[in-house]
Amino acid sequence: AASLGDFDISLYAPAYSSGFEIFGAEGMKSTILKTYAPWQGAEGEETQLFIARNGEQAPADFPGQVLDGDARRIVCMSSTYIAMLDALGEPQRVVGVSGIDYISNPYVASHKEQIGDVGYDGNMNYERLLSLSPDIVLLFGVSGASAMEPKLRELGIPYAYMGEYLEQSPLGKAEWLVAVAEIAGMRERGEEVFREIPLRYDSLKTLAAKAERKPVVMLNTPYGDSWLMAPPSSYVARLIADAGGQYVYT
């Protein structure tokens, strides 16, 4: 069996994202998806997913989650991952979601009877989750590891952290669709889909830069006594600037 050190071939090093990388080993079909700083304040933290293919085993010293083969039944804890699977032409792989009534994806909206709503991070319906027989749960952490982790380990359901919302550029966020494609066993398709996105984005950015007026933009609505706004370093602020707007915080 291969050792962890054998997985030192970078199969995909993102051009825009700083949150993940995909590694392989000589002569092996299996890959390792590494996620860097997967939640706020997680600098130096790293999570790993071993995607076992061709009957290969994870190295004995592998510290992360193990997915047995390409994921065909996926539970998405954020609607972002649904959009990425849709962009890959594979929305039917979504078997479970969080908060189905708030999801606008056409496939999910038209298949509510077949897709299970598993609840939210702090209030999960694990019986429903188990009944979906998922290959993997795509989840996220906000200010720490997901509260779902211990129970998913107990149930033997693999999970992977998606840190796309922490990216500082819209293209960095979009590039996570390659990570989702790797999990689904279709990285080449993911690279192909993503390749077009920066070209379209940059042409629109150039067009927006010619606008004479830059509207001032605020985000969200008040919640309780607070008005939560994305920081100026976030992908949202970058998106507003690139679209020809002026973020109220900058």
Provide a role label for each language-model segment.
Residues 90, 155-156, 243-244:
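Short, structured coil segments at secondary-structure junctions
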Residues 228-250:
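Alpha-helical, coiled-coil/dimerization segments enriched in small aliphatic residues
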